[in-house]
Design a protein with these regions (language model features):
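Cytosolic Rossmann-like ligand/nucleotide-binding regulatory domains
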Residues: 2-67
């Protein structure tokens, strides 16, 4: 699940590329069941979404650490 600070924000607001040096290349929604490649900037993240990230391992680990 996404870090709580990501929930109910759209990708443009999060600006992950500039802030964390990672890209969201896909999102798997659980409700409704959907897999979206290259989600649009206005996509709003929900608590049960699964984010597929592209970036350096250390940068992705930093995103994962936000969940703790």
């Amino acid at each position: 699940e996404p870090p709580s600070e990501f929930i109910n924000k759209n990708l443009k607001e999060l600006n992950l590329r500039a802030k964390h040096n990672v890209h969201i290349i896909a999102i798997k929604e659980r409700s409704p069941e959907n897999f979206m490649l290259v989600p649009p900037a206005d996509f709003t993240i929900k608590s049960d979404d699964i984010l597929i990230l592209l970036g350096k391992t250390d940068d992705i680990k930093k995103i994962k650490a936000l969940k703790q």
